[in-house]
Amino acid sequence: VRPVPILPCAASPAHISASWSRNSPRNGRQAGRESALRERRGAERRRAAGAGPNRRLVFVDRVLVALVALRLGLPHAALAELFEVDRSTVSNAIREIRPLPPARGFAVPDRPGLRLRTLEDVFAYAAAESVDLRIDGTEVQVRRPAPGRPGRKAFVSGKRRQNTVKTTTFSDGQGRALFSGVVRRGRMHDQTAVRSEGIAEQFRQHPQVEAEVDEGCRGLANELPDQVSAPPHKLKDDAPLGERHARREARRRQSSRRICVEHANAEYKQWRPMQRYTGRREDFAETHLAIAALVSDRSARRTTRRTTSTELVLARPNAC
């Protein structure tokens, strides 16, 4: 019996078994891969009966391999030595399991059977449940494209001056992630992504949804001042002292309401691939969505903190 590695993951083995065992991707993904190879060859593959790769990892082992790779970022060769299989077997297992968490969607607090998979789902949920959104972008350093390749500068971030990939996170007022996506190259500004990916259009379709954003989405706050709140504008140098104090207090209050989405981003950064991604850039989006979906399962189980009302209530009705 092979030793099972200790898995520092957000999901327990019981949760993984109950959620994923009925969604094994073997048949669908394998059929799609064989179809693509058939089109590339132009004919059926001539193979003797019983020939082909011997897949020695059962579904539970493939799940463990994928979760260890997502959590710790271990090389596939090291995982192959641990499970006593070939490196290609580990790579195939990770490619099969990695799409499962994004396909399930993001967990919703206090709604066990509800899952959010698209931006439309997020805004519809926020409108129905009167949830104020927190929106923030983050970026992860990736490998630099090869010299001479077209579009090499598209990944260079103007903020970090490194090759990065950016994502956008949506959370509620308690820092529980509702959705994370809008994956784009590091050179694209947050405001450009807001317009090109349909976030601004979703606000127009759901006028009752409100959100807190940072300075990067200033344009969105200018377009929709009744729905989106951004930090106050910077004052002139000759502004009165009272206005400076008022701006500082307003900025502090807005930052206090928005900071919880930074905590949601910090949960992603605890996973090794989100600290610095060393794999293929083409696989980053799928890896990020898988990690974000797993983190949402844990954050959704956090108890909702109820805010005590300060409204005065009469102990007894007034006598007329």
Q: Model-derived features: where do they sit?
A:
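Short, amphipathic alpha-helical "recognition" segments used to contact nucleic acids or chromatin
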Residues: 57-73
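Short, flexible segments with low predicted structural confidence
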Residues: 36, 50-52, 61-64, 165, ...
